Amino acid sequence: MKNVTDSFVSLGHWPSAGSFGFNTDILATNPINLSVVLGVLIFFGKGVLSDLLDNRKQRILNTIRNSEELRGGAIEQLEKARSRLRKVESEAEQFRVNGYSEIEREKLNLINSTYKTLEQLENYKNETIQFEQQRAINQVRQRVFQQALRGALGTLNSCLNNELHLRTISANIGMLGTMKEITD
């Protein structure tokens, strides 16, 4: 133990020039002066330091408040944008649905009008065919009648005398007139 004490004592006697060591002389090291200076620094520096810290704290709080306000504004704008997006999406969906239903409606209208046009064309065709058939039947009747009349006249001319011939012609002309009135 004596060795340890001797080493501390010898440290206190080392010369201070150019070397490191402990100076145990209280008056030489000015611990009183140092404590006074430190006390003054702490007393006056505490106010300055607390002012600096308070200012820094206020700036941080203001920045946080501004950030919160900006965040709130951004959230509000985001909600408005989402609301507009939902509205636009619903309108787009309505336009899409309405567009599809409009297309289907137009398609059905086109199909219906095409069927009506085809029906009308079929009716016109049938009427034209019936008219042409009736006309052909009338022409055939007229030709058959004319041939029958010529044949009858030829037979009558060869078999009858002039007076009977004239009476038969008059009767046939009368019948022709009646037939013509019936057909017209």
UniProtKB/Swiss-Prot annotation:
The chain crosses the membrane at residues 27-49. It is a single-pass membrane protein. InterPro entries: ATP_synth_b/b'su_bac/chlpt (IPR002146). One of its GO terms (cellular component) is chloroplast thylakoid membrane. GO terms for molecular function: proton-transporting ATP synthase activity, rotational mechanism. Pfam families: ATP-synt_B. Belongs to the ATPase B chain family. F-type ATPases have 2 components, F(1) - the catalytic core - and F(0) - the membrane proton channel. F(1) has five subunits: alpha(3), beta(3), gamma(1), delta(1), epsilon(1). F(0) has four main subunits: a(1), b(1), b'(1) and c(10-14). The alpha and beta chains form an alternating ring which encloses part of the gamma chain. F(1) is attached to F(0) by a central stalk formed by the gamma and epsilon chains, while a peripheral stalk is formed by the delta, b and b' chains. HAMAP family: ATP_synth_b_bprime (MF_01398). F(1)F(0) ATP synthase produces ATP from ADP in the presence of a proton or sodium gradient. F-type ATPases consist of two structural domains, F(1) containing the extramembraneous catalytic core and F(0) containing the membrane proton channel, linked together by a central stalk and a peripheral stalk. During catalysis, ATP synthesis in the catalytic domain of F(1) is coupled via a rotary mechanism of the central stalk subunits to proton translocation. Component of the F(0) channel, it forms part of the peripheral stalk, linking F(1) to F(0). This is ATP synthase subunit b, chloroplastic. It comes from Nicotiana sylvestris (Wood tobacco). The lineage of its organism: Eukaryota, Viridiplantae, Streptophyta, Embryophyta, Tracheophyta. The gene is atpF.
